[in-house]
Design a protein with these regions (language model features):
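Switch/communication elements of ASCE P-loop NTPase nucleotide-binding domains
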Residues: 93, 107-213
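Phosphate-coordinating catalytic segments in nucleotide- and nucleic-acid-processing enzymes
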Residues: 1-123
């Protein structure tokens, strides 16, 4: 036990490291001019920077999955090849369903994440803040490749409308059942669909201040 209400366990018990991802929610302008000058001119905000980084991970993920599918097919294991491809399709279906109200769909033949909207091709940098936020979260979970990960999120409800907030945890656990989620939130909508028992109030884990005298 570590403090009140918090317990740390690792599987296996002798694990030497923990894979983790950190997702930041605020879509504020990049303040580091040096970083901004080295990137695509369309990368203007912190969410844009996360998308830019994730695009690189997404390319690596696709190459890795393709190699494993080829190996499975060469070994005569077609069901395994189908299982490997199904997760990416599930991610694409999720995004298409979430963005359906604005008519955006993922271009499934593109190597990078791109969208079609009424015949016009869009980059992810042209999405709304809420759409960027949801894309960052779900793409992060996808490229974790079903591995055990610690997913840290600070107020992920920022910019997400209420329906998306209610679906968020279920979407994450569907894409990667091996992800452990730790998040801070002020939104009851995030935890109202069966997650109330997993909530820890900050007051339960605060360390009492002692008199320094």
């Amino acid at each position: 036990p570590h403090g009140n209400g918090v317990k740390r366990e690792t599987v296996p018990e002798d694990a030497t490291h923990i894979r983790f991802d950190v997702i930041r929610s605020i879509d504020r302008p990049l303040i580091n001019a040096e970083i901004a000058s080295q990137l695509d001119f369309k990368v203007a905000t912190e969410l844009d920077l996360q998308i830019y980084t994730l695009q690189r991970r997404y390319l690596d993920y696709q190459v890795n999955i393709a190699n494993r599918m080829i190996e499975a097919l060469q070994n005569g294991n077609a069901p395994e090849a189908q299982r490997l491809s199904a997760v990416k399709t599930k991610f694409q279906d999720m995004i298409d369903r979430l963005f359906a109200e604005t008519g955006k769909t993922i271009i499934r033949t593109a190597n990078e994440i791109r969208f079609l909207q009424i015949g016009e091709e869009l980059t992810p940098y042209q999405l709304s803040s809420g759409e960027k936020q949801m894309l960052v979260i779900l793409l992060t979970v996808l490229v974790e490749d079903n591995q055990p990960y610690l997913l840290l999120m600070d107020e992920p409800e920022v910019s997400l409308h209420i329906d998306w907030q209610q679906q968020l945890i279920e979407l994450i656990t569907t894409l990667n059942p091996n992800a452990q989620i730790i998040l801070t939130t002020h939104s009851p909508a995030l935890i109202m669909n069966g997650w109330m028992d997993s909530v820890t109030e900050v007051s339960e884990i605060e360390v009492p201040q002692t008199d320094s005298k």
